């Protein structure tokens, strides 16, 4: 948990800290987006290296460089450095975010052969991640209340260092399977798989909404003179998402996961459209608990489908491409959200988030329905034997 806390902390902390130093949501959105782009851009290479040499060398490297990059970003903001230098520090920091989540999600299908258990495990993991996204904004709100926004960025750096050290001492890492003989998989690797490619494209679309939502809610709270409330509302959104994952993971579903994935995305889009006209911060927080409940199930189902569509020797790289799609979408959403709230309104930004998620659902419905139908026919044929 400690080593994964920067996932729910660093991007938003950078956004608010840079905004306080530059007085611009557009610049802050750009720097936060560059950070997320660094995470997303290097992830496939990290995954390929994990498949090839195991996770320990990369965890050591990231545990050292990531805190240094975030400290450098704070120093640059304090000295009013050029935006280009801020972007460079953010890019390096994002590129070396410790790959703890990728390691965990790669281990799960190797440890659990039963499909229902794997679905439950990914749901539990999504709940843990959502708890991180609850704790992250809450901690940011604490630092904002103290008028020490840099503290949130520095705290993320410390968590990454301490968490990586602790994770490397766990039995799962010590007992990581010895990598098999390396097999060439080409430059694109998992992207050559059509189903995975379509899954990644849908992920970019719905995760763009995540980034837009962050900026829209923080901008709305800031405009009303209560920036700390924005962090609380985002934490409530994560609570709702975690409840959704708990409900989803508590039972076995007869419906194929491809169709579950599409339905969850449609539900998420409807929730975002419902939030768009709400401007009262208390009601927005309450409604976020309900409207955001499909978010974690969408992410859990994405992991189930990646594990289902991927050969075992390529699991880490496939999950890092999934992370690239997810974080790349968040990065795009933060940048676009910053522009929309600067030139339009938080209402327009929330509508854009809903449209992006609805597009993801439509793409998934077209791209994955054929795969679901094929699996149903195969299962029916096997049961008839």
Short names for language-model regions:
Residues 169-208, 385:
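Juxtamembrane intracellular "pre-TM" segments in multi-pass secondary transporters
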């Amino acid at each position: 948990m400690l080593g994964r806390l920067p996932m729910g902390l660093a991007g938003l902390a950078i956004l608010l800290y840079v905004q306080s130093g530059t007085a611009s949501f557009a610049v802050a959105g750009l720097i936060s987006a560059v950070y997320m782009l660094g995470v997303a851009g290097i992830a496939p290479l990290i995954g390929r290296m994990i498949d090839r040499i195991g996770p320990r060398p990369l965890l050591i490297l990231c545990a050292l460089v990531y805190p240094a990059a975030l400290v450098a970003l704070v120093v640059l903001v304090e000295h009013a450095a050029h935006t280009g230098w801020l972007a460079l520090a953010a890019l390096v920091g994002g590129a070396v975010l410790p790959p703890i989540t990728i390691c965990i999600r790669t281990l799960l299908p190797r440890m659990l052969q039963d499909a229902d258990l794997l679905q439950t495990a990914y749901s539990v993991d999504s709940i843990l991640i959502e708890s991180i996204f609850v704790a992250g904004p809450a901690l940011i709100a604490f630092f904002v209340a103290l008028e020490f926004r840099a503290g949130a960025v520095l705290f993320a750096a410390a968590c990454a260092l301490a968490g990586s050290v602790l994770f490397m001492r766990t039995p799962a890492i010590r007992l990581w399977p010895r990598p098999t003989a390396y097999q060439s998989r080409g430059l694109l690797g998992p992207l050559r798989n059509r189903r995975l490619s379509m899954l990644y494209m849908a992920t970019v679309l719905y995760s763009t909404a995540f980034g837009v939502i962050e900026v829209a809610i923080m901008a709305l709270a800031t405009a009303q003179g209560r920036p700390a409330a924005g962090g609380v509302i985002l934490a409530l959104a994560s609570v709702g998402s975690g409840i959704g994952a708990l409900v989803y993971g508590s039972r076995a579903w007869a419906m194929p996961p491809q169709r579950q994935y599409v339905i969850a995305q449609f539900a998420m889009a409807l929730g975002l459209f419902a939030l768009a006209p709400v401007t009262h911060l208390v009601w927005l927080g309450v409604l976020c608990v309900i409207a955001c409940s499909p978010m974690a199930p969408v992410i859990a189902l994405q992991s189930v489908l990646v594990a289902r569509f991927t050969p075992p020797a390529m699991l880490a790289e496939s999950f890092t491409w999934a992370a690239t799609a997810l974080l790349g979408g968040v990065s795009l959403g933060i940048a676009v959200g910053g522009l929309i709230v600067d030139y339009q309104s938080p209402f327009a930004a929330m509508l854009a988030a809903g449209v992006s998620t609805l597009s993801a659902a439509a793409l998934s419905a077209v791209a994955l329905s054929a795969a679901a139908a094929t699996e149903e026919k195969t299962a029916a044929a096997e049961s008839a034997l």
